[in-house]
């Protein structure tokens, strides 16, 4: 029995201007959540000094979290959805389109 799908990803070579500021990261994450048809319950973002962002979106299906290191061009993503497993795949694809990493690695876990 699979109750959900969980993608854990590291994106490398992401442009600094996409991941240094909370406003930009928030905009991208919120757009992905919306376009992937996930049900947002709430969100919290933290801007680090001098740069870098952590954010988490609580969704009815589970959660989306992001951590950025602009100085390394690095984004760590965690996307977990219960129910329709296609939504996690759609969200991940959208993140790749938005962040345009030079490379990435990811792990897909079927939960349950």
Swiss-Prot record:
Keyword tRNA processing: no
SUPFAM superfamilies given in the database record: S-adenosylmethionine decarboxylase
Cofactor: pyruvate
Enzyme active site: 62 (schiff-base intermediate with substrate), 67 (proton acceptor), 82 (proton donor)
Enzyme class: lyase
Site positions per UniProt: Cleavage (non-hydrolytic): 61-62
InterPro entries according to UniProt: AdoMetDC_fam_prok (IPR003826), S-AdoMet_deCO2ase_core (IPR016067), S-AdoMet_deCOase_pro-enz (IPR017716)
UniProt GO BP: spermidine biosynthetic process
One matching Pfam family: AdoMet_dc
Catalytically driven reaction(s): S-adenosyl-L-methionine + H(+) = S-adenosyl 3-(methylsulfanyl)propylamine + CO2
Protein name: S-adenosylmethionine decarboxylase proenzyme
The species this protein was found in: Archaeoglobus fulgidus (strain ATCC 49558 / DSM 4304 / JCM 9628 / NBRC 100126 / VC-16)
């Amino acid at each position: 029995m699979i109750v959900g799908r969980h993608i854990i990803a590291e994106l490398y070579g992401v442009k600094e201007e996409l991941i240094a500021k909370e406003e930009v990261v928030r905009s991208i994450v919120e757009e992905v959540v919306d376009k992937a048809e996930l049900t947002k319950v709430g969100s919290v973002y933290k801007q680090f000094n001098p740069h870098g962002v952590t954010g988490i979106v609580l969704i009815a299906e589970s959660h989306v979290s992001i951590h950025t290191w602009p100085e390394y061009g690095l984004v760590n993503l965690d996307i977990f959805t219960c129910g329709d497993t296609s939504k996690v795949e759609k969200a991940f694809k959208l993140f790749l389109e938005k962040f345009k990493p030079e490379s990435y690695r990811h792990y897909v876990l079927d939960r349950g």
